[in-house]
């Protein structure tokens, strides 16, 4: 089990050039690159940036959107942990929030040779050590198709969907 103090997370947070920002209860880290200044500038308004982007998914618990700030395009996701059950939130008392966990896992996948969108920034809000909000910002993968579009274009999409479900279950277990 990874904790908020795991060496893998510390390595990601302390990469050369990564900038950390603390704004009230928001803890926010932006990796080095041409995106850094633009993504640092949106920290105080991150909720509005995501909500007003090109929304790809919106639910009570999360919003995912394609966004552009100062000519920098990115994918951003906001997970609202306050909409989740308390016991679910409690596990993140010692574990990193999903945004930081995603950054660490993406790094592992990239080193293993599995291309995954590069994490540009990650952040979370905590109240009394419990995650209330989690933010992940990645590069946009141009030309990527949604799973829905890909499945609908396949002649045996029912079987493909079933197999995809089995694979997803294995990945999440």
Residue ranges and their predicted role:
Residues 2-54:
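Juxta-kinase regulatory segment immediately upstream of eukaryotic protein kinase catalytic domains
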Residues 38-146, 155, 163-173:
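Conserved ATP-binding subdomain of kinase catalytic cores across diverse folds
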């Amino acid at each position: 089990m990874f904790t908020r103090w795991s060496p893998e997370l510390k390595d990601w947070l302390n990469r050369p050039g990564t900038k950390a920002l603390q704004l009230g209860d928001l803890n926010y880290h932006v990796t080095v690159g041409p995106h850094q200044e633009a993504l640092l500038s949106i920290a105080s308004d991150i909720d509005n940036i995501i909500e007003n982007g090109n929304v790809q998914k919106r639910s009570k618990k999360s919003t995912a959107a394609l966004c552009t700030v100062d000519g920098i395009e990115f994918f951003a996701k906001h997970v609202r942990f306050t909409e989740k059950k308390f016991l679910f939130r409690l596990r993140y008392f010692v574990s990193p929030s999903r945004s930081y966990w995603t950054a660490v896992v993406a790094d592992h996948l990239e080193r293993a040779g599995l291309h995954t969108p590069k994490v540009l920034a990650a952040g979370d809000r905590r109240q009394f050590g419990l995650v209330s909000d989690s933010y992940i910002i990645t590069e946009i993968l141009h030309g990527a198709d949604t799973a829905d579009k890909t499945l609908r274009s396949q002649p045996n999409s029912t079987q493909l969907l079933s197999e995809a479900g089995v694979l997803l279950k294995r990945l999440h277990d």
